[in-house]
């Protein structure tokens, strides 16, 4: 996400390195973690090259329980006295809205609003940046979070499959949730292989579409 001169990465999955090359990502000012499940954080070590030319540590923002888990999972990064060459990352517990400052131009910053959500029995976070919000791996959105999602240009929302799953929204529930939020455009993500892209697309109304690798869009700050 590029916003107000700040470059943000939401989660770092197993193919982050390949996707970063593909997208031409040259700098990262912060990593926003939705939750600590392996498929969303295993690429964290691949932030290393972004610290070669600028040794300013990259902040990692996560819900407190996920931050604690990540400190254990990546202890070689976050413990005191790490050896030279490990990614210089700083963990920050997310307890409310916060600002991310550009590592290259400290006078530039952007406000981040965390969106509490639920992934099965796990408390997780979505993130709102201006009129864009990202909510993946969601089974429930608490009522209190809906007020944080008003007036969106673009929403990216979890939609796994048609069959129920204890930790993800079904397509039907995701569509209902998107209609309730009322973003101008909703893109569904984290789809399984049980539905083809074109078939999914044909089922959706105006202002809704399945996401895909390489998708780009704009939203107001």
Q: What residue spans do the PLM features occupy?
A:
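Binuclear metal-dependent hydrolase catalytic cores
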Residues: 1-135, 201-221
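Cap/insert and terminal regions of metallo-dependent hydrolase folds
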Residues: 140-221
């Amino acid at each position: 996400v590029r916003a107000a001169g700040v470059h943000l990465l939401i989660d770092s999955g197993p193919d982050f390195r390949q996707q970063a090359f593909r997208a031409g990502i040259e700098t990262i000012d912060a990593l926003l973690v939705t939750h600590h499940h392996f498929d969303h954080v295993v690429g964290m070590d691949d932030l290393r090259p972004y610290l070669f030319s600028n040794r300013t540590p990259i902040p990692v923002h996560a819900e407190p329980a996920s931050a604690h888990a990540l400190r254990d999972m990546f202890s070689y990064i976050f413990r005191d006295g790490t050896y030279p060459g490990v990614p210089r990352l700083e963990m920050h517990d997310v307890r409310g809205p916060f600002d991310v400052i550009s590592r290259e131009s400290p006078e530039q910053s952007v406000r981040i609003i965390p969106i509490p959500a639920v992934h099965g029995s796990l408390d997780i976070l979505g993130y709102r940046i201006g009129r864009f919000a990202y909510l993946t791996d969601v089974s429930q959105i608490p009522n209190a979070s809906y007020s944080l999602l008003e007036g969106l240009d673009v929403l990216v929302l979890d939609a796994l499959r048609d069959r129920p799953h204890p930790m993800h929204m079904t397509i039907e529930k995701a569509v209902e949730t998107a209609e309730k939020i009322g973003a101008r455009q909703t893109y569904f993500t984290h789809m399984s292989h049980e539905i083809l892209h074109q078939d999914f697309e044909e089922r959706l109304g105006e202002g809704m579409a399945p996401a895909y690798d390489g998708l780009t869009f704009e939203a107001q700050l």
